[in-house]
Design a protein with these regions (language model features):
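Weak global preference for isoleucine
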Residues: 25, 38, 71-73
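Flexible, glycine/small-residue-enriched loop-and-beta-strand segment within the central core
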Residues: 42-53, 58-95
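Short gly/ser/thr-rich secondary-structure transition/capping motifs
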Residues: 16-20, 37-43, 60
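N-terminal start-of-domain structural block
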Residues: 30, 34-44, 48
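Terminal amphipathic alpha-helical/low-complexity segments used for targeting or macromolecular assembly
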Residues: 1-35
């Protein structure tokens, strides 16, 4: 199953499926420490494939990771609703 399919499955879980969410977090992200939790929905263009989570990371609803390259989130990080983490850029020259 691809990371995008796992992300879709994560976003479709019921609130009572906490064990399933924990399992999918371990599968979606390249690295996920202990006690990580992301409130669905979660969005990433690579499904979290380039995201590294430290220990005890919490993200509220609507986390978006533009993970075209690696994103590192350190231990004991808490994020509010609708946070965007973007590693991509566009050409900066007007030419």
């Amino acid at each position: 199953m691809t990371c995008l399919e796992k992300m879709y499955d994560y976003n479709q879980t019921r609130p009572s499926q906490m064990e399933k969410r924990a399992e999918l977090i371990k599968e979606m992200f390249v690295e996920a420490g202990e006690g990580c939790y992301i409130e669905p929905p979660f969005y990433a263009n690579w499904g979290g494939r380039h995201v590294h989570l430290g220990n005890h990371v919490y993200a509220n609803f609507g986390l978006t990771c533009v993970d075209d390259t690696h994103i590192y989130i350190g231990d004991h990080t808490m994020m509010g609703p609708n946070v965007n983490l973007a590693t991509a850029t566009h050409p900066l020259s007007l030419n």
